[in-house]
Amino acid sequence: MDQGGRSSGSGGGGAEQGKYRGVRRRPWGKYAAEIRDSRKHGERVWLGTFDTAEDAARAYDRAAYSMRGKAAILNFPHEYNMGTGSSSTAANSSSSSQQVFEFEYLDDSVLDELLEYGENYNKTHNINMGKRQ
């Protein structure tokens, strides 16, 4: 393996299987990305299918950095500022067209407030969200 955690692979050029950590080439030419979650006994976490191996590798890097922080072995470590404790700026440095959203758990009272706000908004603006006839 080289410094970036990539295996050297064998065979011809191009983006052969094993070039990037967490990336596999599908038979039809797309690239699948997944990572194992050590918090869930190595359970596979599906990250998606991508047009390029580099996009799939960046998805893996975002997930790895999110899970493991500075201890993560990345495909593109130079894209992450390892000197800071913030992972949000690291994910933004990627040129990928994919966006990553982090959701925070909020208790049911917040959901109830949001639903009530939506209902009140719809009433004051005469928006009918009922079934169409």
UniProtKB/Swiss-Prot annotation:
<dbReference type="GO" id="GO:0009873">
    <property type="term" value="P:ethylene-activated signaling pathway"/>
</dbReference>
<keyword id="KW-0238">DNA-binding</keyword>
<dbReference type="GO" id="GO:0000976">
    <property type="term" value="F:transcription cis-regulatory region binding"/>
</dbReference>
<dbReference type="InterPro" id="IPR001471">
    <property type="entry name" value="AP2/ERF_dom"/>
</dbReference>
<dbReference type="InterPro" id="IPR044808">
    <property type="entry name" value="ERF_plant"/>
</dbReference>
<keyword id="KW-0010">Activator</keyword>
<dbReference type="InterPro" id="IPR016177">
    <property type="entry name" value="DNA-bd_dom_sf"/>
</dbReference>
<keyword id="KW-0804">Transcription</keyword>
<keyword id="KW-0539">Nucleus</keyword>
<protein>
    <recommendedName>
        <fullName>Ethylene-responsive transcription factor 14</fullName>
    </recommendedName>
</protein>
<feature type="DNA-binding region" description="AP2/ERF">
    <location>
        <begin position="19"/>
        <end position="77"/>
    </location>
</feature>
<feature type="compositionally biased region" description="Gly residues">
    <location>
        <begin position="1"/>
        <end position="16"/>
    </location>
</feature>
<comment type="similarity">
    <text>Belongs to the AP2/ERF transcription factor family. ERF subfamily.</text>
</comment>
<keyword id="KW-0611">Plant defense</keyword>
<dbReference type="Pfam" id="PF00847">
    <property type="entry name" value="AP2"/>
</dbReference>
<feature type="region of interest" description="Disordered">
    <location>
        <begin position="1"/>
        <end position="22"/>
    </location>
</feature>
<keyword id="KW-0936">Ethylene signaling pathway</keyword>
<dbReference type="GO" id="GO:0005634">
    <property type="term" value="C:nucleus"/>
</dbReference>
<dbReference type="InterPro" id="IPR036955">
    <property type="entry name" value="AP2/ERF_dom_sf"/>
</dbReference>
<feature type="short sequence motif" description="Nuclear localization signal">
    <location>
        <begin position="24"/>
        <end position="40"/>
    </location>
</feature>
<dbReference type="GO" id="GO:0006952">
    <property type="term" value="P:defense response"/>
</dbReference>
<comment type="function">
    <text>Acts as a transcriptional activator. Binds to the GCC-box pathogenesis-related promoter element. Involved in the regulation of gene expression by stress factors and by components of stress signal transduction pathways.</text>
</comment>
<dbReference type="GO" id="GO:0003700">
    <property type="term" value="F:DNA-binding transcription factor activity"/>
</dbReference>
<keyword id="KW-0805">Transcription regulation</keyword>
